[in-house]
Amino acid sequence: MAERRVSNGEEVVINVSDKEDSKDPRASPSFNPLASPDSDAGIEKSKPVPPISIPTPEIYKFSGSVHKPPKIPSPEGLVRRKSLSRSIYSKPKSRFGEQQSFRYDSTREENGGRSLREQFGAGSFARGSFDRASPNNKSNRSVASAALSKVAEEEPDENEEIYKKVKLHRVKRSGMKPLAFLELVVFMAILGALIVSLTIDVVNKHTIWGLEFWKWCVLVMVTLSGMLVTNWFMHFVVFIIEKNYLLRKKVLYFVHGLKKNVQVFIWFSLVLIAWICLFDGDVKRTRKTKRFLDFITWTIVSLLVGSILFLVKTFALKVLASKFNVRNFFERIQESVFHQYVLQTLSGPPLIEEAENVGRVPSTGHLSFTRTKDGKVKDKKVIDMGKVHRMKQEKVSAWTMRVLIEAVGTSGISTISSTLDEVNNKKERTDKEITNEMEAVAAAYDVFNNVAKPNHNYIEEDDLLRFMIKEEVDLVLPLIEDADTGKITRKTFTEWVVNVYTSRKTIGHSLNDTKTAVKQLDKLITGILTVITFIVWMVLLDIASTKLLLVFSSQFLGLAFMIGSTCKNIFESFMFVFVMHPYDVGDRCVVDGVMLLVEEIDLLTTVFLKIDNEKVFYPNSVLISKPISNFYRSPDMGDYVDFGIAFSTPAEKIGCLKGKIGEYLVANSQHWYPEAQVMVRAIENMNKLVLNILVQHTINFQVYVEKSLRRTALIIAIKRILEDLEIDYTLLPQDVNLTGHK
C-alpha cells in the first residue's frame, strides 16, 4: 500500500507494506533534565550560559506562544542604514553574502494575520557568514554518518537505481528546431535524388568529373546528413541501455557524456569509408587530381584521429569528475539529501500515524525534487531514502552519484508548507525554495508548529514518530542539539534548519567550483589536442618534414624554457585540486598561522576570507607546499584554559576545584566531554601556581563563534567556582623607595 500526498508540485510518497501484524515502533523518549538548559517545559535549567550557534542577533528576537507568531522585524519596519560608499548597482562581493545592518522601527506593528513566509519572502536578510559557511556540527555529522553506515551494514548493498521519474504533466512538443528541420529537409532531398539516380538509367549513367551521379549523392548524404543519422543511432543506443537495468546502472552516465564525441567519431568514419570506397584507386587520374584527392583523404584521416583523441579526453574527464565527486562529496550529499527529506516529511501530514490507524506497517519514505532549467520545470525525480541509507561510497555508481548531485545542486530546500502558501497567494513566485537564512527561520517556525502538539513549545520523539518510522527518527535525533533530553525546543530546531540551509548552499558552491575547475582543465587539454591534431595533419600531408620538425622542436624547447614555470604551476595546481584536495568550499582552515574560510576554489587559485571578511587570493601552486589545518574535517577538538592561583592554596581546594569543573562539564554534556585534566604547568617566584585545564569540545572549531561562546561560558563558570572556593592570587610585597626633592 502506498499513500501519496500532492500539493502544487510537491510530493511526499510513503510506502506501506502489506504485513498486518506489527510492533508499535514508538518508544518512550528518554529524558535527562541536566542536559537541556533551554527547555521550556519546566526542566531544571543549569546556570552556565547556553551556547549560541547562530551569532547574528536577528534570530533571537523571535519569541511567542504556539498560537501567536513570534515578534519578527517585518520588511516594512526595517530601515536600511545609509552607506556613502556602496552603489545601488553593486553586487555582493562574497558568495556567502555580505554583512547588512538593519534598524528595527518599534513604532510599526506587525500584522498578526500574515504568515512568517509572507513577511520574510519580501526581503532578503543576507548576513556575513564567516561563521556560517559550513555549519555542520562535526560531532553530529560523525554520529549521522555512523548511523547511516549502521543501516548500510544491516542490509546488503545492491547498488540499485535510486530514482524514478515522475511525470508532472504531459508536455506537448513545441516543434522541431529550425536547424534540425533544415537537416531533415536536406536529407530527404538527397535521399530522393539518390533514389532517382538509381532507378532512372539516364541519370544513373550521367557522370560528373568522372564519377557517377549516385556516388555523388551518397558522398553528399554522408557529409551533410551524417550527423543527423548518427544522432538517431545514438538515441536508439541510449534507449536500449535504459531498458537494460545493468547497463543503465554502469554505463548510462558515460553514454550521455560521450554521446556527442561518439557521434562525431562515427560521422568522420562514415565519411572516410565513403570517400575511399567511392573514389576507386584503379581509375587513372592526373597527378594534380590525385594530389587533391590524397589531400582530402589525409585531412579526413586527421580529423578522425582528432575525434579519437577528443573522445579519450572526454572519457578521462568524466571518470575524473565522477571519482572526485564520489570521494569528496558522497557523504555530505547523502546527509544533505536526508536533511531535505526530513524537512519535507515533517512539513506534510502525519502519514505514518494515518498508516498505523489503517493497521499497516509503514516503510521508509521518498524524497521528491524537481529540476528546473531557464526558470521552467524540466522534470521531477523521486529518491528512495531506504536505498540511499544502504548505499556505500565504494560501490556507488556514476549515474547514481549524478542523480544525487542533481538533487543537491539543481534544486534547493523546500517544504510542503511553502507550496500551501503559494496556493493561498497566487501572486507569489512559483519557486518557493528557501533562499536565505531568514526564510529558513520562517520555515522552521511553520514545521515546528506542524509537528509539535498544541500548546507545546517542544517536540518529543512521539511527535516525530507520527511522520517517520522509528529507524529514521533514530537518525534525526542525533542531528539536533539537546535532542538527547527527549525534548527539542523551538530554538534548537530553528538552529538546525538554518544549519541545513547553509550546509546545502555550501555543498552547491563546492559542486559548482568543481565543475568550473573541470571545465578549465577541459579547455587546457582541448588546446593541446588541437595542436597535436594539426601536427598529425601536417605530417600525413608531408608538409612537415623531419628537418622542419627539428626546427620547430628547437623553437618549442626555447618556448618551454620560457613558460616552463607556468606549466609546472598548472601541473601542481591540478595535483593540489584533484589529488590532494585538502579542503572544500566553506571549510575553515589555518594557513601560515592565519585562520581563513574557503570561499572559492579554482583550478589555479583559491579565494579565502579572513575573520574580518578580507579576501585573500592564494595560488594553488603555493598552497601545495604549505601545511594546512582543516577544522571541518577534524574530529571533536580540545581546548585549554590557563590561570594562576596563590602558591599557598591547599591541595584540598585544588581537588575541589577539579571536582567542581567536572560537575560543570557533566551538567553541560551536550557541549563538553565529561572528563577534564587539571595540571600544574609551572611555579613562578615561589608565589604563583599556573594551572592548565584541558577540556574537549563536542564539536570541532568550524563554527568558531560557537567554540568561543562555549569557552567564554567555561571561563565564567571557573571564575565563579574560584570565588566560591575563595581561591585567589596576590602579588608579593614590593619594596617602594620614595625619594624626596627640595
UniProtKB/Swiss-Prot annotation:
A Gene Ontology term for the protein's cellular component: plasma membrane
Keywords: Cell membrane, Ion channel, Ion transport, Membrane, Phosphoprotein, Transmembrane, Transmembrane helix, Transport
Transmembrane segments annotated in the record for this chain: 180-200, 221-241, 261-281, 292-312, 524-544, 559-579
Keyword Transmembrane on entry: yes
Function: Mechanosensitive channel that opens in response to stretch forces in the membrane lipid bilayer.
UniProt GO MF annotations: mechanosensitive monoatomic ion channel activity
GO terms (BP aspect): detection of mechanical stimulus
Membrane topology recorded in Swiss-Prot or TrEMBL: Multi-pass membrane protein
Phosphoserine carried by residues: 28, 36, 142, 145
Lineage of the organism: Eukaryota, Viridiplantae, Streptophyta, Embryophyta, Tracheophyta
Entry-linked InterPro entries: LSM_dom_sf, MscS-like_plants/fungi, MscS_beta-dom_sf, MscS_channel_2nd
Region (Disordered): 1-117
The family this protein is said to belong to: Belongs to the MscS (TC 1.A.23) family.
Tissue specificity: Detected in the epidermis, cortex, and endodermis of the root tip.
Subcellular locations according to the entry: Cell membrane
One family name in Pfam for this protein: MS_channel_2nd
Biased composition (Basic and acidic residues): 17-26, 105-117
The name this protein goes by in its record: Mechanosensitive ion channel protein 9
Organism this protein belongs to: Arabidopsis thaliana (Mouse-ear cress)
